[in-house]
Amino acid sequence: MRAVVQRVSSSKVTVDENTIGQINKGLLVLLGVTHDDKSSDVDYMIDKILNLRIFEDENDKMNLSLMDIGGELLVVSQFTLYGDCRKGRRPGFSNAARPELANNLYEEFVKKAKDKGVTVGTGQFAAHMMVELTNDGPVTILLDSSKSF
């Protein structure tokens, strides 16, 4: 499982000109799933993302987590995080999970974040979405549950 985590002052996702998910201060998470991901990958990513200390404390040091500041989460499915561009000029997506598995794990991720008391907005799985964000920093972190990077 891969995630691009961006610290934002606000973010929203629209489908067909309708806003379907919106947050204020918090994290925008673009979430990708691969073939062998399972619930343990979701647990790893939830723990890591909710507890990443990437918000400033009173001394302007990145020392506070989303949980510490009571921030919000906007989660958007993103199969293109598994795009392979090593050959040719068009990415291949064979490393992305099949939609059934990806959607199940995406929904599990959202549920587990909500179960932790986080306000969560979402995109729409497999839809063409417009994502707007106001980066704060900017701070952008790449995560991979297999710890590839």
UniProtKB/Swiss-Prot annotation:
A GO BP entry: D-amino acid catabolic process
Localization, UniProt: Cytoplasm
Cytoplasm in keyword set: yes
Catalytic activity: glycyl-tRNA(Ala) + H2O = tRNA(Ala) + glycine + H(+); a D-aminoacyl-tRNA + H2O = a tRNA + a D-alpha-amino acid + H(+)
Family: Belongs to the DTD family.
Subunit (UniProt): Homodimer.
NCBIfam families: D-aminoacyl-tRNA deacylase
PANTHER family: D-AMINOACYL-TRNA DEACYLASE 1 (PTHR10472:SF5), D-TYROSYL-TRNA TYR DEACYLASE (PTHR10472)
Domain notes: A Gly-cisPro motif from one monomer fits into the active site of the other monomer to allow specific chiral rejection of L-amino acids.
Name of the protein this chain belongs to: D-aminoacyl-tRNA deacylase
Name of encoding gene: dtd
